[in-house]
Amino acid sequence: MRSVSITRTSVRFVSDKASRFVPKSGVYPQGFSVGGIHCGIKKDGKSLDLALLRNDFGKDASAAAVFTTNKFKAAPVQVSSKLIKEKKGVGINSIIINSGNANAVTGAQGMKDAEDMILVTDSVLENPVNSTLVMSTGVIGNNLPIDNILSGIPKLALNNLGSTHEHWLTCATAICTTDTFPKLVSKQFELNGHTYTLAGLAKGAGMICPNMATLLGFFVTDAPVTPSALGQILKYSVERSFNSISVDGDTSTNDTIIAIANGAAGGPVIDNNSSTAESFAVVQKEITGFAQQLAQLVVRDGEGATKFINIHVKDALSYKDAKIVASSVANSSLFKTAMFGQDANWGRILCAIGYSKVSTADSIVPTKTSVSFVPTDGSEELKLLINGEPEVVDEERASEILKSEDLDIVIDLGTGGGQSANFWTCDLTHEYVTINGDYRS
């Protein structure tokens, strides 16, 4: 069980997961600089709470974003979604992010504060007006200490930006709240004789059940991708990554994922038309895999979590059905507590499959459904149910599998449709209750 120290919404990274999942180095896209500082939102007086990304390349970047479906959308969500729609994804060249305060359900003052964060950032960076998107995360219902933020933006923008690994890690740390480690991923891929780089960061440990939860993130690339293509790629990749994870079943007021492409690495422009279809497919595959890697880190850092669980549903009639079934299991509190207790109570899995809201009566046929625990160490799977018939389960073997930190659960619906989906979740523990019971104390 990990130890977490919380002062309102700041943390000390004391989990062993920090040493395992925080990269010691990375590769980063050309033409971007990032950084983070403490500006005075978090009350401990030192935790980083303001982050900034800037496009340094001489041309306007392409941008796309997806936002929370929660009806109580936070002020930064409302302002940023309106802005990116008005600009049609062209000329978004920076992102300003604060942590420690969500600026959600804060009325007209909250809207003004979000707009002022954009205004000051654009002014300091000498951007054209409305070239910045804003994100916030933290406690809901409190007004921002806006004077601290507005005075911190020049300090951050003029003195604390850079493109080193340390700058990227500082930026990732500055957006954390109850996270026990900053989430940062980078990679390179080849296309059309050019080497392109992806870098991304995310925050989130609780209130995670997206259709888009308190989940913030952005990833950037130096590949030349049009706004239209980037928007299509982002929606596809988020559906299979950030919208396929769950920690606690809550969807927050602030969820935002932003993608920016500045084209600094050169090469032919990638659009979503027939002439660049092959290149589009490559970029979509790379970004989707990248987004999945980043999203999985959020689950691994689930508040109080001790297990990382991949629920793989196969042979469904459709991808939608497969995902609905996987999501139903992933969000079952009874299933998640059984995983924490290392209890092979597969009846809870079947129960969640059975009440999932799939599209037709033929989507789930009990006599065709099979369930297995699959160890991630390569050893033999443990079959629990085959075509609706229960197996005699070796409880010692089941307990041994469930002691592992990582676990795959395979659900074969046996419909003949051949469609599959993955959904990533974690267990539900005593510590989750402790963290969230003390969140504002």
From Swiss-Prot:
Where in or outside the cell?
Mitochondrion matrix
Q: Which UniProt keywords apply?
A: Acyltransferase, Amino-acid biosynthesis, Arginine biosynthesis, Autocatalytic cleavage, Mitochondrion, Multifunctional enzyme, Transferase
List the pathway annotation: Amino-acid biosynthesis; L-arginine biosynthesis; L-ornithine and N-acetyl-L-glutamate from L-glutamate and N(2)-acetyl-L-ornithine (cyclic): step 1/1; Amino-acid biosynthesis; L-arginine biosynthesis; N(2)-acetyl-L-ornithine from L-glutamate: step 1/4
Q: Which reaction is recorded as catalysed by this protein?
A: N(2)-acetyl-L-ornithine + L-glutamate = N-acetyl-L-glutamate + L-ornithine; L-glutamate + acetyl-CoA = N-acetyl-L-glutamate + CoA + H(+)
Chief location of this protein within or outside the cell: mitochondrion
Q: Gene3D superfamilies under this entry?
A: arginine biosynthesis bifunctional protein suprefamily, ArgJ beta chain, C-terminal domain, L-amino peptidase D-ALA esterase/amidase
Site positions for Cleavage, renumbered to this chain?
213-214
Give one Pfam hit by family name.
ArgJ
Q: Which residues form the active site?
A: 214
Q: What else is known?
A: This protein may be expected to contain an N-terminal transit peptide but none has been predicted.
Q: What does this protein do?
A: Catalyzes two activities which are involved in the cyclic version of arginine biosynthesis: the synthesis of acetylglutamate from glutamate and acetyl-CoA, and of ornithine by transacetylation between acetylornithine and glutamate.
Assembly description: Heterodimer of an alpha and a beta chain.
Family matches, as HAMAP family: ArgJ (MF_01106)
Identification of the protein by name: Arginine biosynthesis bifunctional protein ArgJ, mitochondrial
Native organism: Scheffersomyces stipitis (strain ATCC 58785 / CBS 6054 / NBRC 10063 / NRRL Y-11545)
